[in-house]
């Protein structure tokens, strides 16, 4: 068979996203490709194509930013790295005509954050990869799952566009704002017995990565009980940063205003042991805050990549929730908790490990998971479903 000429039309037609070769039982060599729409360097004004892989080249790594390399005389840009066989994560490309974003040879953490902040609005998904969505920071990303990546319950089901949720507008007197809320019910059971799950960053799970077909599939498979799901929009990054980190007003408004509104539409159980609060990053912090302060209402906490460093972003001091637990101001006694963090988000992993150590006396009711991934919704989506399965497993015994 004749080898295809690099950069030819037939060569590009043979590419369907990243390619990998096994190096050994644990590692693969992975190559990413991008086609310059302007052609070769003779015609193109593109100076750099930054590659932003969550948990590998992102700002959480505090490492030198990586640019793809052009193959001279072609429209081909490529970049190669090594990844674990069980790795899963999202990535994007950032083509730019500028060559001065990361001018320092070894930029520090603040320079990295600022540089990526400038670049990410220009990010694009991999045109060769059919799996893409809008990431949490608003830019397009694509998915990469290595051959031995852990199974993600329910995400193997076909997308079913006919499955939709009821969308309402919640006008909060306490918070002085309005937002969208999605209400979704599954299964067939006495309405008052249905468990309740509150999902933070609801707009992401409703629109960017819709959970409806996944929840429906897992309920049909009897891995999840029939339930009511409430997805709360964060409004925007400013409201999110104010309302989610340890904000009593937000959770009082949820309990006093939103939940009665939801209950009139889709009745659910008031039992704390049937109620899950789930969130990621600031949302993970917020979920545990709700459980610690209102355990009589929120008995199950699903925290993924929780920002337990808050409010000390540098990570040099303990976060406020850990301080309160150590001082005995709050107690996790009686809660069931899923605590998950990625080994490729160092500061968040350290904060979660410290929290888990503090919670260790009640370890029988804690599910602690370390994921080979970063600060990444592609990882969170599997942990979200597995967490619901684990937290609600006792309900199946109640019914038997």
Language model region names:
Residues 169, 198-266:
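Cap/lid segment of the alpha/beta-hydrolase catalytic domain
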Residues 202, 234, 302-311, 343:
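Active-site nucleophile loop of the alpha/beta-hydrolase fold
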Residues 87-95, 183, 194, 250, ...:
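Short beta-strand segments enriched for Tyr within beta-sheet-rich domains
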Residues 182-185, 192-203:
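Short beta-strand element of the alpha/beta-hydrolase
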Residues 2, 23-25, 29-86, 96-153:
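Aromatic-rich carbohydrate-binding modules that target alpha-glucans
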Residues 309-379:
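The feature captures the conserved acid-bearing segment of alpha/beta-hydrolase catalytic domains
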Residues 379-389:
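Post-His helix in hydrolase/transferase enzymes
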Residues 210, 270-324, 330-331:
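Primarily recognizes the serine-hydrolase "nucleophile elbow" in alpha/beta-hydrolase
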